[in-house]
């Protein structure tokens, strides 16, 4: 079995060695320009067109949970990968726990009014504030995939009312499920904290805009953990300035790194992190990839395959 590997920033030697240990019958090599030798599987991130074009691969693994970048490239270069070759994304591989940590810590930060207390501290004001109740602090999750399910599961333990919005109906215990555009308003109008975990598709680009934000209760919060292109940043800032939104926590941006001139840097009610909410953990990724390749070789059912038409 031949496996080719390409990632512009990962420690390639470590990955090659770890994959060969996990798959003793495989030969793993770093792909370099001019390498047209046969391969059965390709593990990639931001691959050049020539790496995949014309190859008779059994499968391709994108080395991340998000596949919007590689799908965009495949759409621009359809000769790059035959539609019959399955494309897989990393399923969880430690990202679920990281998303849980991030979401729970931020929801609790807002719920306990730590943002307000930080503002008071900056003014040297000693002023206890009224507490919020859980009943008024409904959390709504846009995007009900693997990571959305993990976040909902972690928040359940804290007793917040939970709801999700997705393409298909979910039957998660303790979570109200809303489906499609026709139920979006009902989902939004009782959501105090909006968590975005949607995939990046043509239908979701710019979805967090003034029209959507206006449907949230006054004083709502937005937590974006998905993609920066989901948010119309000017609309978000306008909602913050008007008081419609009380705060926003952003891990992703339409342009990364975020330009120095962006007003998001200086807005007092915007907090941010540099796209670190959930990163690929190599050991967990190796385990998922090696297990999935073994299942494919045996003809067994697998999970994590991308629906290229849907975009996730």
UniProtKB/Swiss-Prot annotation:
Domain of life, per lineage: Bacteria
Entry EC number(s): 1.1.1.79, 1.1.1.81
CDD domains recorded: GDH_like_2
InterPro entries in the cross-refs: D-isomer_DH_NAD-bd, GhrA_Enterobacterales, NAD(P)-bd_dom_sf
Record key words, sorted: Cytoplasm, NAD, NADP, Oxidoreductase
An annotated Gene Ontology molecular function: hydroxypyruvate reductase (NADH) activity
Keyword set includes Cytoplasm: yes
Localization terms from the record: Cytoplasm
Catalytic activity: glycolate + NADP(+) = glyoxylate + NADPH + H(+); (R)-glycerate + NAD(+) = 3-hydroxypyruvate + NADH + H(+); (R)-glycerate + NADP(+) = 3-hydroxypyruvate + NADPH + H(+)
Purpose of the protein: Catalyzes the NADPH-dependent reduction of glyoxylate and hydroxypyruvate into glycolate and glycerate, respectively.
Protein name per Swiss-Prot or TrEMBL: Glyoxylate/hydroxypyruvate reductase A
């Amino acid at each position: 079995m031949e496996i080719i590997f390409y990632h512009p920033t990962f420690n390639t030697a470590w990955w090659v060695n770890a994959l060969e240990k996990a798959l003793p019958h495989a030969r793993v090599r770093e792909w370099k320009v001019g390498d047209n030798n046969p391969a059965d599987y390709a593990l990639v991130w931001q691959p050049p067109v020539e790496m995949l074009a014309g190859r008779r691969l059994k499968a391709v693994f994108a080395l991340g949970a998000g596949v919007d970048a590689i799908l965009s490239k495949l759409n621009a270069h359809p000769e790059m990968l035959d539609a019959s070759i399955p494309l897989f994304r990393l399923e969880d591989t430690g990202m679920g726990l990281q998303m849980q940590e991030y979401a729970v810590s931020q929801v609790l930060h807002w719920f306990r009014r730590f943002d307000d207390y930080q503002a008071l501290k900056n003014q040297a004001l000693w002023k206890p504030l009224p507490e919020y109740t859980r009943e008024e602090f409904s959390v709504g999750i846009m995007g009900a995939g693997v990571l959305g399910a993990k976040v909902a599961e972690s928040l359940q333990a804290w007793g917040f009312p939970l709801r999700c919005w997705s393409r298909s109906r979910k039957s998660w215990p303790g979570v109200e499920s809303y489906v499609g555009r026709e139920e979006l308003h009902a989902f939004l109008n009782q959501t105090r904290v909006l968590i975005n975990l949607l995939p990046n598709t043509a239908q979701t680009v710019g979805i967090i805009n003034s029209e959507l934000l206006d449907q949230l209760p006054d004083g709502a919060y937005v937590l974006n953990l998905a993609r920066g292109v989901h948010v119309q940043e000017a609309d978000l800032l306008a909602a913050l300035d008007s008081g419609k939104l009380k705060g926003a926590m952003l891990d992703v941006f339409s342009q990364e790194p975020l330009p120095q001139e962006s007003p998001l840097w200086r807005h007092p009610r915007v907090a941010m992190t540099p796209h670190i909410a959930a990163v690929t953990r190599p050991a967990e990724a190796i385990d998922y990839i090696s297990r999935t390749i073994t299942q494919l070789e045996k003809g067994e059912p697998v999970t994590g395959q991308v629906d290229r038409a849907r975009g996730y």
